[in-house]
Amino acid sequence: DQFDCVELLKPLDYQSRYGHGTNQIVLGPDDMLYVVSGNDVAFPEGVAKDSPYREPHDDHLLPEPRDAVQDVRVGHVLKTDLDGKSWEVIAGGFRNPFDLAFNSAGELFTYDADMEWDVGLPWYRPTRLNHIVSGGEYGWRWGTGKWPEYFADSLPSTLDTGLSSPTGLEFGTRGSFPSPYRDALFMGDWQHGRILQVSMSPQGASYTCEYGVFLEGGALNVCDLTFGPDGALYFITGGRGSQSGLYRISYDGVEGDAAIAAVAANDELVQRDRDAAAARELRHQLEEFHQRSDASGIDLAWPYLNSEDRWLRFAARLAIERQQPAQWRDRALSETRPRASTAALLALARLGRAEDQTALLNALDRLPLESMGSSELLDALRVWELSFIRQGSPSATDRVRALARLDTLYPHSSNYVN
């Protein structure tokens, strides 16, 4: 057999620093192609200007000069139709994610690499599983510039797995393994010669995870894995001069219905799953406004600026940020609920309009900083930081006022706040 034809859908600009190129193409449940690339690949020409993820910035108030000479390429996920006619950037801020996988609810995940040189340093980011959402910013930047997870304009990892070399991803729903493997995510680790098994629990609009070792062995450099049409798990090994091989793991038992029925009948789990499904559906409704200019999105999103769920708050803030500033600026400046105020002012600061700076700083001054928890306080400090980065240096009056306000917080019990 041979291909009838070979057609170039899109040239991708690969400028090698460390071999972090375009790694995988996956067909999504929406019959669209999802392409994941590492941080050596620039956004291709012709991507939609209204993509959910746009124009990554370093956004450090005191950048490291040696990092500043690097461009702002980040690992990212593209989405395109089967003909390759329309392209958009879904999410970014990764180092070198190797693969993508959708769970049974249609939620997307990737397994991102750490930077081994950074081990033991404050900016080290462990190898991590990320839940990919519309417009998601996951904070990888060059050198020392990696964002801490508490930055309000980013999203946290869903699971950290420490030192490893991420490779293939696959959910057990494609195989014939019994419970609990059926709902697990299988992740390849080339460095340690193992396959990890991740169990997920819905939490709000995202998930929490636990993991264990499903399989490991010496000289078992797992490169990729997938479930075959027979329901078995296939994986391939090799690379960098190591032994290459193709392996199959199959289940030869019969899954009983009793255990599945017992879990399904657990009222607490049923209610948890219903609540989580509703939260994810709400997040999807908010995400529709990440690419749509429609003032109705402001009223829909505004209540969720005050949500305790970080994933809902992120989706709501981005939905508002994508609307015309004149439609929500005054509402942001007059918001009185501390968490909602911080999220709204974050959106205003990210727009980088110098004419809004004094009013924004005045609104920040009204926040009850002394009574706010550490996480809310860090969110507020991020707004000050982004104002000075994107809106420009403050006036002498604004500078003195900001120094006086922030000086009252030091020293703080949180090292991150300090």
Short names for language-model regions:
Residues 1-288:
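Beta-propeller domains with acidic blade repeats across secreted/periplasmic ectodomains
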Residues 134-150, 154, 198-418:
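Extracellular/periplasmic ectodomains of large secreted or surface enzymes and adhesion receptors
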